Amino acid sequence: MSDSTPASPAPTPSSDPNLLRILFLGDIVGEPGRKGVSVVLPMLKDELKVDFAIVNGENSAGGRGITPKIAISLMRCGAAVITTGDHIWDQKEIVSFMKDEPRLLRPINYPEGTPGYGSIVLETAKGKVGVINLQGRVFMAQQLENPFPVIKAAVEEMRKETPIIFIDFHAEATSEKVAMGWHLDGQVSAIVGTHTHVPTADERVLPKGTAYQSDAGMCGPIDSVIGSQIEPVLERFHTMRPARFGVGSGAVRINGALITVDPSTGRALSIERITRHWHD
């Protein structure tokens, strides 16, 4: 007589406790974004059983850069690493802070001798996780070193220590981001873009096991122009004259991505867009 007891379902990426879950939140914009992240990030870590959280703090200080105080507050609410981009130097006091805080990253393809760190490896209960911050060049005012050879060398070096590698590629052009995804497929666990503040619907795991998304979006005010107040932006488009952009206000959208990784190989098993709403 056969055993009629149904077989236990195979573990899925969302249920297997042995897999590593990395949460990444896109560009945090100003005080509204910071407040939203301070509330939502701890909730997401609990809800999604996150092992390692990364946030982009590029625009967290009034839309331009990040301060030491803000960096510390983001770490206290659950960010293991903070990535940045072209606005990293906007707040002058951050330079001395970065020298002693390796968890706050700036793009790795700045010239040799630039203050701060472009990458870091941290220990977790499920193995070491490496994070690299990279900046693109297409349509970007800052022309840093070519990101393609720079990241290749950085990844090769980091893989000596861990196969679990996450890359925040801060870039404007989607084509440059997509090309970088193919450039790194099979060599890193995930590459997720930032900078445009608009989440893309192209998340996927590439053929060789790298999770990819062109842009994670932003953590900032919904009723805005990619985080900025609407009226000054409209004025600039109408008059073609300079206008000061403040950060928008009101309800906040939290955008990001959840990547599930096999810690033994570093291969991504899934990537999922994350969206939450918060209002003060």
Task: Enumerate the predicted regions with their spans.
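Acidic, metal/ion-coordinating pockets
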Residues: 2-280
